[in-house]
Regions:
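Membrane-embedded segments
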Residues: 2-84
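Loop/turn elements at helix/coil->beta-strand transitions in domains of secreted/extracellular proteins
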Residues: 16-18, 44-47, 166-173, 199-202
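Acidic/histidine-rich helix-loop elements
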Residues: 19-24, 146, 150, 223
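Active-site-proximal beta-strand/loop segments in catalytic clefts of secreted hydrolases
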Residues: 22-25, 51-53, 175-179, 206-209
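Acidic-and-aromatic substrate-binding clefts and catalytic sites of carbohydrate-active enzymes
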Residues: 26-30, 149-154, 180-188
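Secreted/periplasmic serine-hydrolase-like ester/acetyl group-modifying domain
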Residues: 65-170
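C-terminal regions of proteins
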Residues: 187-234
């Protein structure tokens, strides 16, 4: 949801903030940790905003592995990249992510011709965000402020992310973007408030902010990914 909901160029235009959207699709918090560490080697931010949508997901979800190419394929070969791949993927996946040409070697003609489908609609001037036009009928939605009682799989990674930020003079901020998700998914994200209070970290729970978001008009699909109208409101 962050790919579509946070537009760096609007932050620059409206507030003079320079930023980059480093989000990927189906991103576990363990993967977020590795993205932050590798990105900070190129440019250390003053502030890192961490989305908590997948706070309930463990890092070893096999169906999320393919999405990790969105980040790792752009990272040059290095010991740091190997450490990140090793920390976030099982050993049988390491070669594919360290040497991605083994995955694409039969597709060069398709890629060079420009006929291949793009997984992310992102241009350089969009600073990592994507823009998808359209409107989709959202899922049924009822707001809840309850919290999941038990600790969730992503909390350990969140703690490590916050510790890394503080050790490297980066201000950590947690965030939940509004979407027509189930009450259980909301309860999971609401639980991030407990961690934020414990560690004295800001938590922007935009489900409760007066953003003016209308899921009927501001989403391009039923899952609540924002179209440009929705992203502008966030």
């Amino acid at each position: 949801h962050v790919l579509d909901g946070v537009t760096p160029m609007e932050l620059w235009r409206d507030y003079g903030l320079t930023s980059y959207n480093m989000a990927t699709s189906s991103e576990t918090l363990g993967m977020t940790e590795q993205i932050l560490k590798l990105s900070a080697q190129t440019h250390k931010p003053k502030l890192a905003v961490i989305d908590v949508y997948y706070i309930d997901k463990p890092d070893d979800l096999e169906w999320t592995y393919s999405y990790r190419h969105l980040f790792f394929d752009a990272v040059p070969l290095s010991f740091a990249k190997f450490d990140a791949v090793r920390a976030s993927l099982p050993q049988n996946e390491w070669l594919e992510f360290m040497m991605p040409f083994s995955l694409y070697h039969s597709r060069w003609e398709e890629l060079l011709s420009g006929q291949s489908a793009r997984l992310v609609d992102c241009e350089p001037f969009m600073m990592g965000s994507e823009m998808r036009i359209g409107r989709g009928a959202p899922l049924a939605y009822t707001r809840t402020h309850e919290m999941t009682a038990d600790e969730l799989p992503g909390e350990a990674a969140l703690r490590r992310i916050i510790a890394y930020c503080r050790a490297n003079d980066i201000e950590p901020v947690l965030m939940a973007l509004p979407a027509p998700v189930s009450e259980q998914e909301q309860m999971n994200m609401n639980r991030a408030q407990l961690l934020a209070d414990e560690l004295n970290v800001p938590f922007l729970n935009l489900f409760d902010e007066e953003t003016g978001i209308d899921f009927e008009t501001d989403c391009y699909d039923y899952l609540g990914h924002m179209n440009p109208d929705g992203a502008a409101k966030l």
